[in-house]
């Protein structure tokens, strides 16, 4: 990754550290810049040994929803501004995209064009989402999206980040190893995205409380997990009217724990089906997906970080 557009894509002095695995550093002083990219030599031989699945890959994995769909990135939609979108579609005033039913390779719909997918660019409304943009769908939706494979067989949690709004809907989530919905199993009870926690606290449904209270939120973090929820990640600031607020402190930014159990390497599909098909204008919103090994959320000595 790079912090400067047009740079070498390697920031000097930044190196990820994993306990028990030192890694192989990049020799940034010897990087070469041919016509079509960059070449970064390594200072040692990089091998895929037992440390990779047992140490390096036993971390929380977070995927922005649009990164799960190749076409969003290869066609320049992900992260686009309103001005860039106008250039793409060659039509002034456009700040959102509506996609054809079979546009995405890793997304399957089960009711044809009744499920409407939309992408709202990051500077259109300043949404309180990760990176400010919003991928959502409307109508009596019923679709499945392919998730990344886990790096190693084991016990994991799957969570979804979303922004609660009264305009949202209510849905049932299913999980399976293929897009064949007859083989999928329901995950927990339906999720009601319409429920917005009160800024003063929401003990009954989500367990959310202002993050500065009760030991800086540590006590209510556990209360939320008992309800099947988590706060938004401390990793990013929200946009829009609440700009400047950390997601963790924003009452609408939530994570729902969808599944906890054994997962094997291989294909993984998640289905989202409305339980309110008559509410055709209600929205489904997916901000990001987290796949988390049990060594992170159930470590015998350490609590999972709030980022």
Whereabouts are the PLM-identified features?
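FKBP-type peptidyl-prolyl cis-trans isomerase
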Residues: 2, 33-48, 284
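Extracytoplasmic
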Residues: 6, 12-19, 45-307
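Short acidic, Pro/Gly- and aromatic-enriched capping/linker segments at domain boundaries
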Residues: 13-33
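Well-ordered beta-strand scaffold positions
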Residues: 21-24, 38, 178
């Amino acid at each position: 990754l790079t912090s400067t557009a047009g740079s070498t894509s390697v920031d000097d002095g930044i190196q990820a550290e994993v306990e028990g695995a030192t890694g192989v550093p990049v020799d940034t002083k010897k990087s070469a810049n041919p016509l079509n990219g960059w070449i970064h030599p390594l200072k040692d031989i990089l091998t895929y040994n037992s440390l990779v699945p047992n140490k390096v890959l036993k971390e929380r994995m977070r995927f922005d929803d649009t990164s799960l769909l190749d076409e969003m990135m290869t066609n320049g939609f992900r992260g686009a501004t309103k001005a860039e979108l106008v250039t793409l579609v060659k039509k002034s005033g456009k700040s959102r995209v509506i996609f054809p039913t079979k546009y995405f390779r890793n997304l399957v719909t089960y009711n044809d064009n009744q499920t409407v997918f939309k992408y709202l660019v990051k500077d259109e409304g300043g949404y309180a989402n990760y990176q400010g943009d919003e991928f959502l769908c409307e109508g009596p939706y019923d679709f499945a999206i392919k998730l990344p494979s886990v790096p190693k067989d084991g016990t994991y949690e799957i969570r979804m980040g979303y922004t609660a709004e009264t305009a949202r809907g209510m849905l049932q989530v299913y999980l399976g190893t293929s897009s064949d919905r007859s083989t999928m199993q329901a995950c927990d009870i339906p999720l009601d995205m319409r429920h917005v926690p009160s800024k003063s606290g929401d003990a009954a449904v989500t367990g959310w409380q202002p993050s500065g209270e009760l030991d800086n939120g540590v006590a209510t973090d556990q209360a939320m997990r008992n309800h099947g929820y988590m706060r938004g990640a401390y990793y990013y600031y929200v946009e829009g009217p609440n700009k400047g607020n950390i997601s963790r402190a924003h009452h609408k930014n939530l994570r729902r724990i969808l599944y906890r159990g054994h997962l094997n390497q291989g294909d993984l599909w998640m289905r989202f089906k409305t339980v309110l098909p008559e509410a055709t204008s209600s929205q489904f919103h997916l901000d990001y997906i987290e796949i988390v090994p049990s060594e992170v959320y159930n470590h015998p000595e350490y609590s999972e970080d709030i980022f």
